[in-house]
Swiss-Prot record:
Occurrences of domain Phosphagen kinase C-terminal (ranges): 24-254
Full protein name: Protein-arginine kinase
One GO term of the biological process aspect: phosphocreatine biosynthetic process
Keyword Transferase belongs to the record: yes
Regulation: Appears to be allosterically activated by the binding of pArg-containing polypeptides to the pArg-binding pocket localized in the C-terminal domain of McsB.
Gene from which the chain derives: mcsB
InterPro entries reported in the protein's UniProt record: Arg_Kinase, ATP-guanido_PTrfase, ATP-guanido_PTrfase_AS, ATP-guanido_PTrfase_cat, Gln_synth/guanido_kin_cat_dom
Length: 354
């Protein structure tokens, strides 16, 4: 695996799979926050300590195969251009926070479904991504990587509190589990606000597609646990999975209601969006996201035939500003991005239909 391959292949291999409930759940993510006993927290570290952590990973974990994940590549933020960092964020491989650091780094697996962020808010954050609703599978992979790393380093751990982290909400298991979920039915029936309120009362967090502070573009929401203290990893996963399954049922009911009461209006909405995507010469990211959401809904309901349902996930990533500019070989103005976005979508749909 090389940096060029990571940058030039916008769609990570894990995105191409179909997991359970993938008609509504786009992806599952597990993140484990860990700190090393011998170093100060990242927020208090000096430059030398951050470099030591990078060198530790370069020495112990690079060019070593971990079954079944293969070899890992170390990407240092200060060796990447701002555009390359942005691409990694848009592919969900690193956080915006890590992209903004000079001494952060990312240990990335060949399939790109596992990344270990170094010198972010914590010394390391292990992230595992799976398609569909596969929280338990993602946790299993994260724990394998966690055990692999712990053979070489000693974590900051307290017998009564658990893993010690920079943010108090992560103390305990250090586990943040999240699910990316497509909810056009609940949005169209105007039930989404009530659902979000219920989710929040259960102690969960609802965010946009790129996490904290981001918009729910394309009717895609990210639902995650908040507290990690006092619960086991299995309990956190079970609680979140139970809520997600209820949301899935609510979304299915909302879709059925729309089909029963407004079938022709919904079909018209789907085909109008399909027409925009298939024929536009300029399209902004927000409009593209909304139209792609409609198209995906039309595919899931059987209105549109012959197009993969993965097209929403794929084109939501491919049409992000950073990836468009990476493909173009340099910076693009807003109108140039809109032109390239429209061209890419048209071409992708043409390939699907042929």
């Amino acid at each position: 695996m090389s940096l060029d391959k990571i940058m030039n292949e916008a769609i990570s291999p894990w995105m191409k799979g179909d997991g359970p409930d993938s008609d509504i759940v786009l992806s599952s993510r597990i993140r484990l926050a860990r700190n090393f006993k011998k170093y100060q927290f990242s927020t208090m570290q000096n430059e030398e300590e951050t470099k030591q952590i990078q060198e530790l990973f370069k020495k112990e974990f690079i060019n070593k195969t971990v079954e079944p994940f293969g070899e890992f590549e170390l990407l240092k933020m200060n060796e990447l251009t701002p555009l390359q960092r942005r691409v990694l964020v848009e592919k969900h491989l690193i956080s915006p926070n890590l992209a903004g650091t000079e001494y952060g780094a990312c240990l990335l697996s060949e399939s790109e479904h596992i990344s270990v962020m170094l010198n972010e808010e914590d010394h390391i954050r292990i992230q595992c991504l799976f398609s569909g609703l596969q929280l338990s599978e993602a946790l299993q992979s994260a724990n394998q990587i966690d055990n692999w790393i712990e053979k070489e380093v000693e974590y900051a751990f307290d017998e009564s509190l658990g893993y010690i982290t920079s943010c108090p909400t992560n103390v305990g298991t250090g586990l943040r589990a999240s699910v990316m979920i497509h909810l056009p039915g609940l949005v169209l029936t105007k039930r989404i606000s009530r659902i979000i309120q219920v989710i929040q009362k259960l102690g969960l967090v609802v965010r946009g597609i790129y996490g904290e502070g981001s918009e729910a573009l394309g009717n895609i929401f990210q639902v995650s646990n908040q507290m990690t203290l006092g619960k086991s990893e299995e309990d956190i996963i079970a609680d979140l999975k139970s809520v997600i399954q209820q949301i899935i049922q609510q979304e299915k009911m909302a879709r059925e209601l729309i089909v029963q009461n407004s079938s022709i209006e919904l079909e018209d909405k789907v085909y109008r969006s399909y027409g925009i995507l298939a024929n536009s010469r300029l399209i902004q990211s927000a409009e593209a996201a909304n139209c792609l959401s409609d198209l995906r809904l039309g595919i899931d309901l059987g209105y549109i035939q012959g197009i993969s349902r993965n097209i929403l996930t794929e084109l939501m990533v491919l049409t992000q500003p950073g990836i468009l500019q990476q493909y173009a070989g340099g910076p693009l103005g807003p109108e140039e991005r809109d032109y390239r976005r429209a061209t890419l979508i048209r071409e992708r749909l043409r390939i699907e239909k042929n």
